[in-house]
């Protein structure tokens, strides 16, 4: 079984956005991936973009995948528990459905940000943002 942990974030929401992804099997990380995705995106758009890329990367390794995210909105939309009302999110939702066709089985799971693998994906996206000059704001 292959597991993906994906995370997307935007500084400013909306603002500059990036994604971070890990692909793992048998407790070992096979792939670490991060990418800057735009200068004006929302957190929800970034979460969907991260999942789409995670599915693309996982399809190179398996036909059965469990996708783990910390976005309750995205997971519940994919499970049909929430409607997709935002036109941009609907476009991304449909892209996810298209990517799912590459698999025999796709499962979705929402976890806390404190999940150790989710934290790695989060670190990857934050490193990507910082590499492009978008520093975290520190509140004092």
Name the predicted role of every residue range.
Residues 1-45, 56-63:
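RNase H-like nuclease fold core
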Residues 47, 51:
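Short, conserved alpha-helix that lines the donor NDP-sugar binding/gating region
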């Amino acid at each position: 079984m292959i597991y993906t942990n994906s995370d997307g974030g935007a500084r400013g929401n909306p603002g500059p956005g990036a994604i971070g992804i890990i692909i793992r099997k048998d407790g070992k990380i096979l792939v670490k991936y991060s990418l800057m995705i735009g200068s004006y995106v929302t957190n929800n758009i970034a979460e969907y973009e991260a999942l789409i890329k995670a599915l693309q990367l996982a399809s190179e390794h398996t036909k059965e995948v469990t996708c783990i995210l910390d976005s309750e909105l995205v997971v519940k939309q994919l499970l049909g528990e929430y409607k997709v009302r935002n036109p941009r999110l609907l476009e991304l939702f449909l892209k996810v459905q298209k990517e799912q066709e590459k698999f025999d089985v796709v499962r979705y799971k929402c976890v806390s940000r404190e999940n150790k693998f989710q934290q790695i994906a989060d670190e990857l996206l934050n490193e990507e943002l910082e590499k492009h000059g978008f520093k975290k704001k520190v509140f004092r």
